[in-house]
């Protein structure tokens, strides 16, 4: 048996070395690899005064086509600063830039983050070293999940996603070490609890949407410590409450961010998902005029100024939105259902990942780096949508099964490391998904829910690895772990199968189409034939796109045209899992006679192949009078 333990320990160390190799290969590559800035990196730049080394007029703009390697010190912009634990890592790069004449290669920032990851992995390995199966599971997660390019491409950036992944990784590992200790009737080591609290603070302050995530992770630990260390448990609960209060109420947020998020959630997600938008708007305290902007987002205001059509939504409190969702749970469920297909984009192809190459994605990264850059993200993104729907539904089943197992075992005073790990991972994933949609609607939902991808991947790794626990040790505990893993697999598959059937039926009935009308750009137009152009997608496929006017005129659009974004990029980069995405453009023309009365209400309707009709745009067109 000691010989077997030594072999397992060596394998675990080798896996950590493999993960380190994968990380270093990506962050040190030439040309530089990292996700390009679609604008949000500007918020961390504003905090620390570190900007892309481009013309001054270009520094504040988005550069989503490709990442920029060189950064320079510049002015801080406190009013635009997004306070996050990401600033801690960025500050190191700023200090090095100060030493080297004010410029720094962003790979230096990547090296700082990689060092933090490796030190954390080695410390956690030492913590788990007395439990070979735990050490091996942790090493597998580090090598396969943390070392996956879909995660390591965040290192050479100023995005907040890295700090979320880093602190979630450490927090969940420490949760298992604390709450699944062998003797639950003895206190957890105080130093371990303090480190756990620090990691929870780092996680809670990584992104505003994670203000309650530390509470989800900390509750099992606090419960397990309740009897032998009541004061430590209370202290942990005080910490997570303080995180929520500070993040939600104390840290300043730029008014533009608040307004944009409100528009994307209320107008872009909640009202379109409601069966009675007028009643929902009334419950939110919005005037009926706001219904004219239903379906609008901050970036696509449907030809209007939202300050004039619906100023009330811009300053709406999140408390009012939360109260509405509690009052209309079916609306909340439809919001989640409508965003479900977009969660399959693990690849994030709309963010270029290679310096000086336009929208180069995972395949191009692998061509630069080789085997260390093999990623699960393209594989998941390319899955048949029905299979992805089943797998994601199964993760929800796994969350329910693991939560029940945790409650049962903790009530009996038994250690439950597998159930705890699965609960924390799937719970964190679904927390990220829910808060992404109700935090910023469907705008970049796959990126805002990015934490879900590594958590679900890690849950799959832990679950499969646990099936082979008897190979690590022949004791009764390993056999129980294998049986428990098989039980979790069976339960999640059964629940996932049932839920995916319900989802498939619901998707046939609920309006699921997405799309944009990008012309006309203004709703005040000449009294002449008026062309509507844009794109439309639907999970079952688009059968037709129609313009419907308030005088009952119906104009069929020509659908199936090529479509390119504002920078000439393919729509597939944003919505890779939808059918017909390479020919999703449409064009329709309203005759001049339709504008004869001066004003005209026009709705753009997408007809799915299942027959469901979805409104994607509504406008009040006003003809100019000369």
Residue ranges, per PLM feature:
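Perimembrane helix-loop-helix junctions
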Residues: 2-5, 213-241
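Membrane-proximal stem/loop segments at transmembrane-domain junctions that anchor or position
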Residues: 43-78, 252-364
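Short hydrophobic/aromatic helix or loop-helix immediately within or flanking a transmembrane segment
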Residues: 63-103, 110
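Basic, ligand-binding patches in group-transfer machinery
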Residues: 491, 495-626
């Amino acid at each position: 048996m000691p010989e077997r333990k030594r072999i397992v320990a060596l394998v675990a160390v080798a896996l950590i070395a493999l993960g380190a190799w994968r990380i270093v290969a990506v962050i040190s590559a030439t040309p530089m690899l990292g996700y390009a800035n679609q604008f949000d990196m500007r918020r961390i730049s504003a905090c620390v005064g570190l900007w892309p080394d481009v013309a001054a007029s270009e520094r504040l703009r988005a550069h989503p086509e490709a990442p920029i390697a060189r950064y320079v010190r510049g002015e801080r912009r406190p009013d635009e600063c997004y306070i996050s634990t990401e600033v801690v890592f960025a500050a190191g790069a700023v200090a090095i830039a100060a030493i080297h004449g004010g410029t720094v290669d962003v790979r230096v920032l990547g090296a700082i983050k990689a060092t933090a990851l490796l030190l954390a992995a080695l410390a956690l390995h030492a913590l788990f070293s007395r439990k070979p199966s735990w050490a091996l599971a942790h090493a597998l997660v580090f090598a396969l999940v943390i070392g996956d390019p879909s995660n390591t491409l965040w290192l050479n950036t100023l995005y907040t996603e890295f700090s979320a992944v880093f602190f979630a990784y450490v927090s969940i590992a420490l949760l298992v070490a604390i709450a699944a200790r062998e003797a639950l009737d003895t206190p957890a080591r105080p130093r371990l609890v303090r480190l756990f609290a620090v990691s929870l603070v780092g996680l809670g302050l990584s992104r505003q949407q994670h203000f309650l995530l530390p509470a989800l992770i900390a509750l099992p630990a606090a419960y397990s410590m309740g009897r032998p260390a009541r004061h430590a448990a209370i202290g942990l609960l005080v910490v997570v409450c303080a995180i929520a209060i500070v993040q939600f109420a104390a840290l300043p947020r730029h008014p533009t961010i608040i307004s944009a998020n409100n528009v994307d959630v209320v107008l872009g997600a909640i009202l379109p998902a409601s069966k009675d938008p007028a009643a929902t708007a009334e419950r939110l305290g919005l005037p009926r005029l706001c219904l004219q902007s239903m379906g609008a987002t901050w970036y696509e205001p449907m030809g209007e100024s939202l300050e004039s059509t619906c100023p009330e939504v811009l300053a709406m409190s999140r408390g009012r939105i939360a109260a509405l969702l509690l009052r209309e749970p079916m609306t909340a469920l439809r919001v989640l259902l409508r965003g479900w297909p977009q969660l399959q984009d693990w690849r994030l192809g709309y963010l270029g990942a290679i310096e000086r190459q336009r929208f180069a994605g995972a395949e191009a990264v692998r061509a630069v780096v080789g085997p260390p850059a093999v990623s699960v993200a393209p594989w998941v993104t390319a899955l048949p949508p029905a299979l992805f729907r089943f797998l994601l539904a199964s993760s929800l089943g796994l969350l329910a099964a693991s939560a029940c197992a945790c409650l049962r075992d903790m009530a009996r005073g038994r250690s439950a490391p597998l159930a705890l790990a699965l609960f924390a991972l799937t719970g964190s994933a679904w927390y990220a998904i829910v808060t992404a949609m109700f935090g910023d609607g469907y705008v970049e939902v796959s990126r805002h829910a990015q934490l879900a991808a590594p958590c679900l991947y890690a849950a799959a790794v832990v679950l499969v690895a646990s099936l082979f626990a008897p190979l690590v040790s022949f004791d009764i505990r390993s056999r129980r772990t294998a049986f428990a893993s098989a039980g979790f697999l069976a339960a999640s598959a059964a629940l996932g199968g049932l839920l995916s059937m319900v989802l498939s039926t619901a998707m046939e009935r609920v309006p699921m189409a997405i799309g944009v009308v990008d012309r006309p750009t203004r709703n005040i137009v000449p009294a002449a034939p008026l062309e509507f152009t844009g794109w439309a997608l639907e999970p079952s496929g688009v059968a037709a796109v129609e313009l419907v006017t308030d005088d009952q005129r119906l104009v069929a659009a020509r659908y199936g045209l090529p479509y390119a974004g504002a920078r000439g990029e393919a729509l597939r980069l944003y919505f890779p899992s939808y059918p017909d995405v390479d020919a999703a453009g449409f064009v329709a023309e309203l005759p001049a006679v339709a504008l004869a009365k001066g004003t005209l209400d026009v709705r753009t309707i997408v007809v799915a192949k299942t027959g469901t009709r979805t409104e994607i745009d509504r406008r009040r067109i006003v003809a100019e009078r000369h």
